[in-house]
UniProtKB/Swiss-Prot annotation:
Catalytic function, reaction form: cytidine(34) in tRNA precursor + S-adenosyl-L-methionine = 5-methylcytidine(34) in tRNA precursor + S-adenosyl-L-homocysteine + H(+); cytidine(40) in tRNA precursor + S-adenosyl-L-methionine = 5-methylcytidine(40) in tRNA precursor + S-adenosyl-L-homocysteine + H(+); cytidine(48) in tRNA + S-adenosyl-L-methionine = 5-methylcytidine(48) in tRNA + S-adenosyl-L-homocysteine + H(+); cytidine(49) in tRNA + S-adenosyl-L-methionine = 5-methylcytidine(49) in tRNA + S-adenosyl-L-homocysteine + H(+)
Biological processes per GO annotation: cellular response to hydrogen peroxide; tRNA methylation; tRNA modification; tRNA wobble base cytosine methylation
Predominant subcellular localization, coarse grouping: nucleus
Record GO terms (molecular function): tRNA (cytidine-5-)-methyltransferase activity; tRNA binding
Lineage: Eukaryota, Fungi, Dikarya, Ascomycota, Saccharomycotina
Protein name: Multisite-specific tRNA:(cytosine-C(5))-methyltransferase
Biased composition (Basic and acidic residues): 655-665
Enzyme class: transferase
UniProt keyword list: Methyltransferase, Nucleus, Phosphoprotein, RNA-binding, S-adenosyl-L-methionine, Transferase, tRNA processing, tRNA-binding
UniProt-annotated binding residues for S-adenosyl-L-methionine: C173, A174, A175, P176, G177, S178, K179, D202, D229, D257
Naturally occurring in which organism (per UniProt): Saccharomyces cerevisiae (strain ATCC 204508 / S288c) (Baker's yeast)
Composition-biased stretches (Basic residues): 1-12
Documented EC number(s): 2.1.1.202
Domain of life of the organism encoding this protein: Eukaryota
Length: 684
């Protein structure tokens, strides 16, 4: 008799929840007023005066919850329809305690209708059953990477960057990773095996590891996470031991979402109200400029760079952009994006702004404590710079946070000419390390010790003729189109002992040529995981690599299954073949599966609907039983999306329902491999 899957809720987190109970408790108590902030932004006159009260009132209101559906997943349309058909009707015309609740709305400017906004108080989500069901849906889909919670305005920079599958992409200040996830999605648009890759960098070691946690959900072999100060991001060699200046990686696309004062986030970061002052923007200006200039150095000819902040302060925005244009001259230009993102209400960049010190005393160029780059460009410069091509998004325009976005295009790759123009206000950007100016980000990095596992385990590529790999190639019928030179391990011996990873071919070259200069935190997806040694092949294919490997395997370990069989495997653990046969669920499946030798195998499930993708999932086949190798989160998601079963609402099975399986040991065990038997599912 099979065991029922354990649907215990455990320590399930709510969608987007964080341990900030005190902050939530004090939300209503905090005075959302700041006299200096109000005086400063009124003086700037960034929008018509009659909009001020609406702007301020919006800034004082909580930020709506927004989420987007992962566009690179083939079942994105299915997840969207699931939300629109099963949830949206129940969230429309809802009343709570005598008050009509706003229905979810689509973000009109986000491509393919994949982003939505819920402007609903948390008390409603907690107490209203329909909204609670939707929250459970969001929790499950978020856990498996089908959706991401992300502030609406934060979604803009990756879209206007226009990443294609063949691009090399650098995210200079990537944590916590929501924008990086968009870049990866764009890279994988319409292909499981893009030729490009994304390098995600953050200056803080701990935030780099948080970044890995966020991005692992996407299962991309085309991602590398590194830990460097963005101001001094190192040159990446294309080939090892090369001193040729032309043998340096230049990126097609670069995202510069720089550290900023964050005064556009005061709807969610309420402490901005009490902490805000002009000094924050003034103090970060040089750092922001250094990062932007470094990014422009790393940008390929005809490449595109997006500079963005979650600040509304011109000192952090147009002033930085203007100084870069001043330094680089006609080697770069600003891209007009007026025809992009139709439906997004935005304002143009400004060309004039005053400069104030901490006490709101206006300063002039040359005053002590100021940089010339703080100040507005001359009329002649302004006519050339086209700062109106910058984009400003104000909270009251579409019920969002505040944001600033600028798109640069590199017209001519002339690093030396631009370097000569750089003033002493910025460090020598072509240097390989921080030799001049010390900054706060660097100080934080020094204080925070790198986690013990960071960079202690090297990336060692394995000879494709290694005996362990040869067994895998033969057992699974891996074709020669798959690049077998991309397999690596993370141990000093270089021997495949527990896990073998794979990276895309382009990243393999980068890793090998830069092991002495890149602080690599993470790269690759698990390909093979070691299991029992007493079977024909002791390695199973980890399902996070299935989107790649399904294109390169022969059909000798693949068995077709019907939907009823899938449902049975999702609900029951280790069902016995005789039990499946007696229930007449899928006799053809049982007949074919029992003929296979023990070990890893795969099921191909047809949905019988051209609008819905088929499923390709891993199983462990024993002598007498079988087990579906997907994690709890994927199990819940598949049950709900395909069969309408809300597993999160199930009660925990009683002890009487659980029966010991004789062949439980036939399934790979966590104690023998050091890695969970459960892994994300893949689809074809």
């Amino acid at each position: 008799m099979a065991r029922r899957k354990n649907f215990k809720k455990g320590n399930k987190k709510t969608f987007g929840a964080r341990d900030d109970s005190r902050a939530q408790k004090n939300w209503s108590e905090l005075v959302k007023e700041n006299e200096k902030w109000e005086k400063y932004y009124k003086t700037l006159a960034l929008f018509p005066e009659d909009q001020w009260e609406e702007f301020k009132k919006t800034c004082q209101a909580p930020l709506p919850l927004t989420f987007r559906i992962t566009g690179s997943r083939k079942h994105a349309g299915e997840v969207l329809n699931l939300f629109k058909e099963r949830h949206l009707p129940n969230l429309t015309n809802v009343e709570f305690e005598g008050e009509k609740i706003k229905a979810p709305v689509e973000l009109p400017w986000y491509p393919d209708h994949l982003a939505w906004q819920l402007d609903v108080p948390k008390t409603v989500i907690r107490k209203n059953e329909q909204f609670a069901k939707t929250q459970r849906f969001l929790v499950v889909e978020n856990a498996v990477g089908n959706i991401s919670r992300q502030e609406a305005v934060s979604m803009i920079p990756p879209i206007v960057l226009e990443v294609k599958p063949h691009h090399t992409v650098l995210d200079m200040c990537a944590a916590p990773g929501s924008k990086t996830a968009q870049l990866i999605e764009a890279l994988h648009k319409d292909t499981d095996e893009p030729s490009g890759f994304v390098v995600a960098n953050d200056a803080d070691a701990r935030r780099s590891h948080m970044l890995v946690h966020q991005l692992k959900r996407l299962n991309s072999a085309n991602l590398m996470v590194v830990n460097h100060d963005a101001q001094f991001f190192p040159r990446i060699r294309l080939h090892g031991n090369s001193n040729n200046k032309n043998d340096v990686l230049k990126f097609d696309r670069i995202l510069c979402d720089v550290p900023c004062s964050g005064d556009g986030t005061m709807r969610k970061n309420v402490n901005v109200w009490k902490d805000w002052n002009t000094q924050a923007g003034l103090g970060l200006h040089a750092v922001q400029l250094n990062i932007l200039n470094r990014g422009l150095h790393l940008l390929k000819n005809n490449g595109r760079l997006v500079y963005s902040t979650c600040s509304l302060n011109p000192i952090e925005n147009e002033a930085v952009v203007a100084e870069a244009l001043r330094k680089w001259g006609d080697k770069i230009r600003l891209v007009n994006c007026d025809d992009k993102l139709p439906g997004l209400i935005r304002s143009k960049g400004v060309s004039k702004w005053p400069v104030y010190d901490r006490n709101l005393t206006e300063k002039t160029k040359g005053d002590e404590g100021t940089l010339d780059s703080f100040f507005s460009p001359s009329e002649e410069e302004a006519s050339k710079f086209n700062l109106q091509n910058c984009m400003r998004v104000y909270p009251h325009q579409q019920n969002t946070g505040g944001f600033f976005i600028t798109v640069f295009e590199k017209v001519e790759d002339s690093t030396e000419a631009a370097t000569e123009k750089l003033s002493s206000e910025t460090p020598a950007l072509e240097s390989e390390g921080p030799q001049t100016k010390k900054i706060k980000v660097e100080e934080v990095q020094k204080k925070e010790r790198l986690p013990r596992d960071a960079n202690e385990e090297p990336f060692v590529f394995v000879d494709p003729q290694h005996e362990a790999l040869k067994v895998c190639w033969d057992f699974y019928g891996i074709d020669n189109i798959f690049d077998r030179n991309t397999c690596l391990v993370r141990n000093a011996t270089g021997e495949p002992t527990r896990v073998v990873y794979t990276v895309c071919p382009a990243l393999k070259d980068v890793i090998q040529a830069n092991d002495d200069r890149l602080k690599i935190i993470y790269s690759g997806v698990k390909l093979f995981v070691s299991q029992r040694s007493d079977i024909e092949c002791s390695w199973r294919i980890q399902s996070e690599s299935l989107p790649i490997m399904k294109h390169h395997m022969k059909s000798n370990r693949i068995v077709e299954a019907n939907l009823e069989m899938l449902k049975h495997l999702l609900i029951e653990s280790f069902p016995n073949f005789d039990d499946i046969r007696s229930k007449n669920i899928d006799n053809d499946f049982v007949e074919k599966m029992t003929k296979l030798s023990s070990g890893c195998a795969f099921i191909d499930v047809s949905r019988n609907d051209p609008a819905k993708e088929n499923l390709f999932l891993p199983v462990w086949k024993g002598n007498k039983c079988i087990n579906l190798m997907v994690c709890k989160e994927d199990t819940h998601e598949l049950l709900y999306r395909i069969f309408g079963i809300d597993a999160n609402a199930k009660a925990t099975p009683s002890a009487e329902e659980k029966e010991k399986e004789k062949e439980t040991t036939e399934s790979p065990a966590e104690t023998t491999t050091g890695t969970s038997t459960e892994a994300p599912s893949a689809a074809n």
